[in-house]
């Protein structure tokens, strides 16, 4: 069995354990428990963000959405460490924060450049403090940005 098939089987088994009425859906509240049971460890904020993204108003998640979410989350789990490592270059004080203007200059002028508009759009909903962004917020923004997917 291919790794993807094994992973999908694991997701399905965990999902089915919480699908008590066997209707192919779990509640948003159970989502974090199911995610943790397959090796993911989402924070409460991540769970809130995920719920906003995938809840169609019913408060339920079907297996297709769950599987897609987990596949995407696992795909980016390695890159999260890479993003955090790259962020350290900008974290001059070692306190987990970087200057947004330094990030903007680099991301719009080096490598696979973003336009200034793409950068501004990417950070428009980011939580910042005094022109600084925290590493965890930066990771969240990068992972959810269409510019990096």
Curated annotation (Swiss-Prot):
**Gene3D superfamilies, A to Z:** EF-hand
Example GO BP: microtubule cytoskeleton organization
Where does it mainly reside?
other
Task: Answer yes or no on keyword Calcium.
Answer: yes
Q: What PANTHER family would the database entry show?
A: CALMODULIN LIKE 3 (PTHR23048:SF0), MYOSIN LIGHT CHAIN 1, 3 (PTHR23048)
Q: Could you tell me what this protein does?
A: Mediates the control of a large number of enzymes, ion channels and other proteins by Ca(2+) ions. Among the enzymes to be stimulated by the calmodulin-Ca(2+) complex are a number of protein kinases and phosphatases.
Kindly list the places in or outside the cell where this protein is found, as annotated in its UniProt entry. Answer: Contractile vacuole
Establish whether keyword Metal-binding is in the entry: yes
Query: Which species expresses this protein natively?
Result: Dictyostelium discoideum (Social amoeba)
Q: Which GO terms describe its cellular component?
A: contractile vacuole; cytoplasm
Q: Which Pfam families match?
A: EF-hand_7
Family assignment from sequence similarity: Belongs to the calmodulin family.
Residue stretches making up the EF-hand domain: 6-41, 42-76, 78-113, 113-148
Q: Where does Ca(2+) bind?
A: 19, 21, 23, 25, 30
Q: What protein name applies here?
A: Calmodulin-like protein
Q: Name one GO molecular function term.
A: calcium ion binding
The protein's UniProt keywords, in alphabetical order, are: Calcium, Metal-binding, Repeat, Vacuole
């Amino acid at each position: 069995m291919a790794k993807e098939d094994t992973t999908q089987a694991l997701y399905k088994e965990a999902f089915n354990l919480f699908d008590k009425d066997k209707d192919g859906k779990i509640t948003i509240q159970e989502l974090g428990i199911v995610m943790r049971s397959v090796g993911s460890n989402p924070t409460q904020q991540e769970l809130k963000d995920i719920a906003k993204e995938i809840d169609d108003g019913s408060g339920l998640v079907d297996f297709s959405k769950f599987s897609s979410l987990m596949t995407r989350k696992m795909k980016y789990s390695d890159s999260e460490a890479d993003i955090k490592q790259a962020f350290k270059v900008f974290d001059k004080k070692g306190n987990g924060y970087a200057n947004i203007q330094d990030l903007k200059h680099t991301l719009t002028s080096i490598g696979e450049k973003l336009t200034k508009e793409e950068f501004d759009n990417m950070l428009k909903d980011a939580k910042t403090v005094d022109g600084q962004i925290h590493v965890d917020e930066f990771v969240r923004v990068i992972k959810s940005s269409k510019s990096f997917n």
